[in-house]
């Protein structure tokens, strides 16, 4: 849920992406009349078939034309100043270069596990599998562990109001 970095209230249509060493997943996200997030068509692309993220985004937008106001991509690898040397790929994903190449004014690149951590607050009880029953603290800290091409983790600190 990389889109939370951009605050949906500030934008209309947002392109959201999960950029991994094996696959890249893109989807458009918009709000319905009640202000609830609506996920558009989710498309998966084999990352290694492309020279860079911009090629995949261009293909996605040809297949799913939309007026995108902002984009946020969770990338597998360390991110510093909006730039990620992706793990298991030869790509460098840079938010300024993407903004220029795609003509999207607001582009953010964050770590993929940071992106997942933002999405934790959107989960409902039906989305959660309890591994170790106990008495959870509903307003406590949270952690995300994600096995994939690599193993990622992210922690979330609850400050009493938000993560």
Regions found by a protein language model. Give the residues of each.
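Acidic, Ala/Val/Gly-enriched low-complexity intrinsically disordered segments
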Residues: 2-5
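Active-site metal-binding loops of divalent metal-dependent hydrolases
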Residues: 19, 113, 149
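Short glycine-rich, Thr/Ser-proximal phosphate-binding strand/loop in the N-terminal lobe
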Residues: 9-59
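Short, acidic Gly/Pro/Ser/Thr-rich loop/turn segments
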Residues: 24, 78-80, 150-154
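Short acidic-glycine loop/turn motifs at beta-strand connectors
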Residues: 30-33, 82, 157-161
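Short beta-strand-loop/turn "lid" adjacent to the catalytic site in phosphate-handling enzymes
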Residues: 64-109, 114-127, 144
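Glycine/GP-enriched mid-protein hinge/lid loop-to-helix segment characteristic of carbohydrate kinases
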Residues: 131-163
